[in-house]
A protein has these predicted regions:
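Membrane-interface starts of transmembrane alpha-helices
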Residues: 9-20, 123-132, 174, 200-207
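Aromatic-anchored segments of alpha-helical transmembrane domains
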Residues: 63-68, 133-143, 182-192
Length: 246
């Protein structure tokens, strides 16, 4: 996202780019439902009582997938990251706060905190997830254009949407947990991708798409079209009196 923010897009207010979706969500929620709309929006963004296992899933699944990507890249001929590149063990933790603010906080608050709950209930969570994934691919197109591989980036974006919504639906539809998932995923990308260059970097991009896609397929096969391990509770799936996305 930082590459886009340094480009000609929104040259006067580049810092607002990652917050476009949440700004739109706040405006629409205020206009359509007023205070109650904002309350519902904030409740999803701040929903933290979801069980420790889903915090672990949101934070550790991206780490595991990133390690698999690095392993496969090295196995395919890329040089092993050096000790200097890896740095101290806590170095990756220093990337987390900046990654949190740089995109996930603004994006997921808008997409999962506001937009996704208003998708049609007549479709399965998986179908809505794939629709959202396509929208997110379009949203991230400016960033994809400066990525090592445009196609790999967009495929990975859709696949990551499946993983993110798996967390979302199992964590009581908490946008907060998806924010953490997105932050962990971006942190891993910012940590490992700069360790490669040239053809190795392009291969790493395709491994990102392949590993995330494989993980998404496994989750779909295990959980089915609901993406849930257990049936959703009525409180988690209460429909909002808002216009639905067709």
């Amino acid at each position: 996202m930082s590459l886009v923010r340094r480009s000609a897009i929104w040259p006067d207010f580049p810092f607002l780019f990652p917050f476009g979706s949440v700004i739109a969500a706040i405006i629409v929620a205020s206009i359509t439902r007023g205070r109650s709309g904002l309350k519902d929006f904030l409740s999803r963004c701040l929903r933290w009582r979801v069980g420790l296992k889903w915090y672990a899933a949101a934070l550790l699944v991206p780490v595991a997938l990133a390690l698999v990507q690095v392993f496969l890249n090295v196995l395919s001929g890329a040089p092993m990251p050096t000790a200097a590149q890896l740095g101290p063990w806590f170095g990756v933790l220093l990337l987390f706060p900046d990654s949190f603010i740089d995109a996930p906080l603004g994006e997921e608050s808008g997409w999962r905190g506001f937009a996704l709950p208003r998708f049609s209930a007549s479709r399965s969570p998986l179908t809505n997830t794939l629709i959202l994934g396509a929208l997110l691919a379009g949203w991230h197109l400016p960033l994809a254009l400066v990525a090592p591989s445009v196609v790999a980036y967009l495929i990975g974006t859709v696949a990551s949407a499946v993983l993110a919504n798996w967390v979302y639906y199992n964590a009581r539809e908490s946008a907060l947990l998806v924010i953490l998932y997105h932050t962990a995923s971006n942190t891993m990308g910012r940590y490992f991708f700069p360790m490669f260059s040239g053809a190795d970097l392009v291969r790493m991009s395709w491994l990102f798409a392949a590993v995330y896609s494989l993980a998404a397929v496994v989750l779909i096969l295990v959980n089915g079209p609901t993406l849930r391990r257990q049936p959703a509770t009525q409180a988690d799936t209460a429909q909002l009196p808002q216009p639905q996305i067709p």
